[in-house]
């Protein structure tokens, strides 16, 4: 496993955006560890749960902007106020998270849109920035968990 700093790199060519997404290491979700280790800056994160067969299942891809990654991830792993289906998952299974950092809201929106479209086949879950006709994302993760 190699150590990388989570961040998003960006290049463009005419109406096409090319993003390189560098994830943090996947960590077991614990609100106290999140408080001390996750930065309170803007970025993008994923929440996973480990099912009974010990497989990781992607639960959520989300943007953290004004509240920062720390508060958003903590809020997302808290079962209070969630639907019954999500609440059951949060209370039953082990949860994991990873994140990346970016100061650019447009870049975060583009990458979140691409990941939601790719993972969940639903581009309506988020909106891209509108700057490009085509968006590509390549993922890099220290623990080799890649979905695209």
Task: Give names to the regions the model predicted.
Residues 1-59, 63-148:
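Boundary/linker segments flanking structured domains
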């Amino acid at each position: 496993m190699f150590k990388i700093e989570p961040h998003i790199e960006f290049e463009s060519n005419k109406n096409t955006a090319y993003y390189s997404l560098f994830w943090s290491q996947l960590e077991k979700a614990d609100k106290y560890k999140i408080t001390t280790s996750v930065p309170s800056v803007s970025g993008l994160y994923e929440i996973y749960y480990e099912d009974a067969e010990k497989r990781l299942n992607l639960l959520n891809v989300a943007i953290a902007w004004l509240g920062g990654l720390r508060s958003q991830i903590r809020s997302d792993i808290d079962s209070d106020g969630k639907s019954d289906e999500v609440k059951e998952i949060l209370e039953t299974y082990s949860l994991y998270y990873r994140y990346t950092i970016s100061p650019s809201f447009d870049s975060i929106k583009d990458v979140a849109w691409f990941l939601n479209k790719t993972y969940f086949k639903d581009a309506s879950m988020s909106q891209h920035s509108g700057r490009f006709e085509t968006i590509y994302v390549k993922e890099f993760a220290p623990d080799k968990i890649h979905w695209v």
